Amino acid sequence: SIIKLTASSTADSNRTVAHGLGVKPSFVLFRRTSNSAWFVWSAGLTTENNYLYLQDTYGVGALTQNANIWGNQSFTSQHISWRNSYTFSPNEELIAYVWADIDGYQKTGVYTGTGGALTVTTGFQPRFVMIKRTDSSGQWVMLDEPRGSGDNRLYADSNSEEHTGQGESFTSTGFRPRQTTTNDTNTSGGNYIYFAIA
């Protein structure tokens, strides 16, 4: 679901907007169109009011986690939410990209890094995967099949060129993070969220 709207003119108020999915979202990108800050929510984050920034490498603990970000309420099968004058300012133009898991097509999940061999099961062969470490800093790693079966990275938080030969791969039922101690996808004991699309 893609939602374009104008924030209410009422300051210091919790706001909601319908997303039309009929089920609770699993992954949300939300931003004002006049600013570079992308707020990210994932069902894989520790608590309902946690958030990350798509344009930065911060982990959850490096950001001031506050229930005001998402309007002091949980996302539901009907709406997403935010707080005017906290997350966004009154009368700003906003856009939200909202996804829900669909068996066999799309999945948001979590895994713990091993520093070695690891296979993450999604239940389908992905064509796109985005990965982010949440308990520490780490880049938003984007992998996709058209650019090389998951082996070539782009970073959502950076305008740097493609990084090739990184060692990730897709399987018929999921993906394999790089089999080293890289902080971005497979540090031993590291907590990661992912967003996969078939």
List PLM regions with ranges.
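Surface-exposed molecular-recognition determinants
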Residues: 1-198
